[in-house]
Amino acid sequence: MSTSFMKSPRLFFTSESVTEGHPDKICDQVSDAVLDAFLSHDPRARVACETATTTGLIVVIGEVTYEQGYIPIEEIVRKTIKDIGYTDAAYGFDADTCGVMVAIHGQSPDIAQGVNRALEVRSDGQVTEEEVATIGAGDQGMMFGFACNETPELMPLPIALAHRIGRRLSRLRKDGVLPYLRPDGKSQVTIEYSYGRPVRVDTVLVSNQHAPDVTQEQIRHDIIHHVIHEVIPNDLLDEKTKYFVNPTGRFVIGGPMGDSGLTGRKIIVDTYGGMARHGGGAFSGKDPTKVDRSAAYACRWVAKNVVAAGLADRFEIQVSYAIGVARPLSISVECFGTNKVPEETIVRLIDEHFDLRPGAIIRDLRLRRPIYRPTAAYGHFGRDDIDAPWEQTDRAEALRRAAGL
């Protein structure tokens, strides 16, 4: 999002979310459920787990290094699918009868030698363990974090509302309030902004898989009244707000029967709905030595604390890494003209108050725990309903004092 966003008197921005039964999200959840199982068995396990699904089939592949022991991967896969709600063959996909293929092998020793012991430690005997993290970055790349004061959770409003709709659809389905709903679905929200502030909801789009015997009129009525009006504040809706509910007119065939799915294909849904940049690396199925995940979490932690401290109203941070090297290669920030102190000061304060080496991130955010399965649906950020330590604003007051605010 450029600084022109803050200067425009009228601008529209759209973000989407998907429900937990979307084929790509099935794969994300399976990958993270497998990751959690390995971390429960061995907190230092190295895991890179990818999943694919299509009609009647789940395929789990990847690389794992862990203390030996039995991990019942097929059982984990079936339980995850059942928890999502694919429990009936009439849906075209169900936990009890789908095929499960598993092809997981050991991690490359070439990668492991760099991750196990960072370049700074391996190459210089004079450097002490206290000065550098012992864990090098698991790959090269750049990661972004973002926060803004549009919502209490310091997330962009379009993606926040899209996720709320998705969670509400899931709750009403699982509680039996709208029993004709099935697991697959999508939501999309368009917000009208004026000079960088959200002023109204322009458009809401909801598509949800359903039983064949329900009318489109009933679906539209129920979703508008029991979903949209329950999660979107009334003061954001007006007579010009447009509602699209299952605009194709029918959504009976869905889930893996309708579309194949893959881990890592919903990275914008997982993050900020397109309001911020993305480094390209997906999260699910990756243990915290993979900076695609852990550094992106740390960047969100930094960004949320910067905004909570009042240093800026909108804030984006980029960090970059080299494989096997612990220290970030670069840190850059963008405040979109909303900063209360110079950006150079903010970079200095970040360096003073946050250690962005992978080992330090894992330590400070307690990332070796099996906490990842719940993150794999309805966004990794802005969550207060799951264990997400990167959402804490524990350093905001220290940043505020250090900035003299």
From Swiss-Prot:
Q: Which reaction does it catalyse?
A: L-methionine + ATP + H2O = S-adenosyl-L-methionine + phosphate + diphosphate
User: What is its EC class?
Assistant: transferase
Which pairs of Cys residues are joined through disulfide bonds in the record? none
Question: Gene Ontology terms, cellular component aspect?
Answer: cytoplasm
Binding positions for K(+) per the UniProt entry: 50
Identify the stretch annotated as signal peptide in this record: none
By sequence similarity, the record places it as follows: Belongs to the AdoMet synthase family.
Output this protein's name: S-adenosylmethionine synthase
Q: Which gene encodes it?
A: metK
